[in-house]
Amino acid sequence: MTEEATTTLSSADIIEIMKLLPHRYPFLMVDKIIEIDGDNSAIGIKNVTVNEPHFTGHFPEAPIMPGVLLIEGMAQTAGAICAKKEGQPGNLVYFMTIENARFRKPVVPGDRVEFHVAKHKQRGNIWKFHCDAKVDGAVVAEADIGAMIVRKEQA
């Protein structure tokens, strides 16, 4: 993949996301990426519906999206940045660290979550990101995460 291709992608639909990430239903937490700024930042979208399997047990009478899945959506959006930048088939992005995680407000079916992810630093194959999950412009969760790019044959 050329350097130009890695910096000119401004959005990604589900087909492009599935080329970048190995996740599939029911664990693909990003439906669309509406903005990608090179390897600096991205905004991923998750449309939350009551039909998702985790709502059968979390909680049937008052469904709330598990916080860990918000973190996963942040990590997958960050992973798409890494995968797009590296542009090498056969690479995997591993979620390594989570720091400063805060959950501010419940996310419920019908919400549209935006995962705002910004690269904080990169050294070699290690990437650090600050992430905010927002619903209707309000921060519902935030975290600092770390990721590592690994060749599939080394995994």
Swiss-Prot record:
Class in the EC hierarchy, top level: lyase
Q: Where is the active site?
A: H58
Give GO terms: molecular function aspect only: (3R)-hydroxyacyl-[acyl-carrier-protein] dehydratase activity
- The main location is cytoplasm
Q: Where in the cell is it found?
A: Cytoplasm
Q: Which InterPro entries match?
A: FabA_FabZ (IPR013114), FabZ (IPR010084), HotDog_dom_sf (IPR029069)
| GO biological process annotation, one example | fatty acid biosynthetic process
Record's catalysed reaction(s): a (3R)-hydroxyacyl-[ACP] = a (2E)-enoyl-[ACP] + H2O
Read off the PANTHER family from this record.
3-HYDROXYACYL-[ACYL-CARRIER-PROTEIN] DEHYDRATASE
Q: What does this protein do?
A: Involved in unsaturated fatty acids biosynthesis. Catalyzes the dehydration of short chain beta-hydroxyacyl-ACPs and long chain saturated and unsaturated beta-hydroxyacyl-ACPs.
Which protein, by its recorded name, is this? 3-hydroxyacyl-[acyl-carrier-protein] dehydratase FabZ
